């Protein structure tokens, strides 16, 4: 193992995903500090990254970490697919570009769980700071920030019917689900600029790469954190087939590798549950049993109909649609597949929506890998506040081995009931006058699936995760399984922070990219204030 000469860098950031790109930008704003950003993947130049509707084509390619859970006991023993971006921008270069912040009560809940300074009033300024919203500046939105938030450029005409049918089914129309109220139906806001994906790499990293005090290294496998006593002194990276090199950090090491890789790196570094570490062949360094626990994700299932006579994404792969996108950045290929969003409560007594609907003019099954020859419509209920909790743990002491994951999806009866209610409500929306006459047949679950046992069996057979893993380095000053404190410092260690979706105590009620960017914006201020 070799050691880089001197303390060349003040901050070493692991992971050039959504959080890492923000941190690299904000920390390097100070010209007196040196920042190194390390990324295991490569560049984000692929057309599959830039063309919005092509995001499912990235799945299970070299752009994807391609994680999967262990056999999940409550979904017929299936392994659930968990894609994660392996390139600059991380999953912001792979996701569906849906800009959703979550609910004020989500963040107030974080504060109540031992994270002072993370209530909604505290985090809202960081959402605003990061944003360049085409709607302009307001009490809830920013203009002139790095991240472009747009209206959809070429929405499907079916969206009007989806909005009207949702309203007819009792879901009110809402102007802005990222404002003070979330419940209702509206069009998705998207992280696109002129019909093209606008990732965290586009927004935060590329403008900062001209700075002489920021270095970026891609295709670097980080093997773990190096310590000097209880202080993080740098990171160990792979060099060649068998060698390694230590990259020192004079001030801090910051893990921003995401909710799967950040806990994996802590565990590989000997930080975690000592008994589990020994079982994986890792010598324990610091007992912190919460590392990898508290894994949460949003499960979803699709309800799909074949329809007639509407503008759908069927045939979007034809050359004329590619030509339209290349020449005008418009047309079907600007679609995020899910174009209409609804948040609703499926029963009384809930403090907030338990279901989010992703609606679109497309056939979307098996993560977009399954095809259907015909025009379709999908309404997919997503469980936004799951009670199930899972874990990330090591498969071995080899950093090249993917960690083991288990979400325990559908292990809690309340989760099952909310999902079943969401499937029924999807059918109710489709049965309203604006949509009813378009439908020729229900493809998923299918017209024959009617009674409760059949519907639940279908749910367990087809349930998927919607790519929002969080919670595996829980933030709290007081919780017994907390990994980081409210300043995002790893408990019991020095000069080591986790700044990404791992730190969420509970998953937010909506998509997770915007909250991850917010976490990094707030975390960057904490790091600079501590310097």
Task: Give a label for each model feature.
Residues 1-531:
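N-terminal redox-cofactor-binding region of secreted/periplasmic oxidoreductases
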């Amino acid at each position: 193992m070799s050691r880089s000469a001197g303390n060349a860098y003040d901050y070493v950031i692991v992971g050039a995903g959504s959080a890492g790109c923000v941190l690299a930008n904000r920390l390097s704003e100070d010209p007196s500090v040196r920042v190194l950003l390390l990324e295991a993947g490569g560049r984000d130049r692929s057309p599959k990254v830039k063309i919005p509707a092509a995001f499912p084509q990235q799945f299970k390619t070299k752009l994807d970490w391609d994680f999967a859970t262990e056999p999940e006991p409550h979904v017929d023993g299936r392994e659930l697919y968990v894609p994660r971006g392996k390139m600059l921008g991380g999953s912001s270069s792979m996701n569906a570009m849906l800009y959703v912040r979550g609910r004020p009560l989500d963040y107030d809940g974080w504060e109540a769980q031992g994270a002072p300074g993370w209530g909604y009033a505290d985090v809202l300024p960081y959402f605003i700071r990061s944003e360049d919203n085409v709607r302009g500046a307001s009490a809830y939105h920013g203009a002139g920030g790095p991240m472009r938030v747009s209206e959809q450029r070429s929405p499907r005409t079916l969206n009007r019917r989806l909005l009207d049918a949702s309203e007819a089914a009792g879901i009110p129309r809402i102007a802005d689900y990222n404002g003070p109220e979330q419940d209702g139906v509206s069009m998705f806001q998207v992280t696109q600029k002129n019909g093209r994906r606008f990732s965290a790499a586009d927004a935060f990293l590329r403008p900062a790469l001209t700075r002489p005090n920021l270095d970026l290294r891609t295709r670097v496998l980080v093997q773990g954190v190096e310590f000097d006593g209880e202080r993080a002194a740098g990171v160990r990276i792979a060099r060649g087939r068998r060698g390694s090199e230590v990259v020192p950090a004079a001030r801090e090491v910051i893990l921003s590798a995401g909710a799967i890789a950040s806990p994996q790196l802590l565990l590989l570094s000997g930080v975690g549950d000592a008994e589990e570490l020994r079982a994986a062949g890792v010598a324990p360094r610091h007992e912190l049993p919460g590392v990898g626990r508290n894994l949460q994700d949003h499960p979803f299932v699709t309800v799909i109909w074949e329809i007639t006579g509407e503008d759908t994404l069927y045939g979007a792969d034809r050359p004329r649609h590619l030509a339209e996108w290349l020449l005008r950045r418009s047309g079907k290929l600007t679609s995020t597949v899910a174009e209409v969003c609804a948040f609703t409560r499926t029963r009384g007594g809930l403090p907030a929506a338990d279901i989010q609907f992703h609606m679109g003019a497309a056939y979307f099954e098996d993560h977009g890998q399954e095809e259907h020859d015909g025009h379709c419509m999908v309404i997919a209920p997503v469980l936004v506040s799951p009670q199930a909790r899972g874990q990330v743990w090591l498969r071995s002491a080899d950093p090249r081995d993917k960690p083991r994951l288990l979400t325990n999806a559908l292990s809690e009866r309340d989760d099952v009931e909310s999902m079943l209610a969401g499937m029924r409500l999807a059918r109710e929306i489709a049965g309203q006058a604006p949509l009813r006459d378009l439908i020729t047949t229900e493809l998923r679950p299918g017209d024959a699936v009617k009674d409760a046992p059949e519907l639940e069996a279908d749910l367990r057979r087809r349930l998927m995760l919607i790519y929002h893993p969080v919670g595996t380095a829980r933030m709290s000053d007081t919780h017994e399984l907390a990994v980081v404190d409210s300043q995002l410092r790893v408990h019991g260690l020095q000069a080591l922070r986790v700044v990404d979706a791992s730190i969420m105590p509970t998953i937010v009620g909506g998509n997770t990219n915007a909250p991850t960017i917010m976490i990094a914006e707030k975390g960057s201020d904490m790091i600079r204030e501590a310097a």
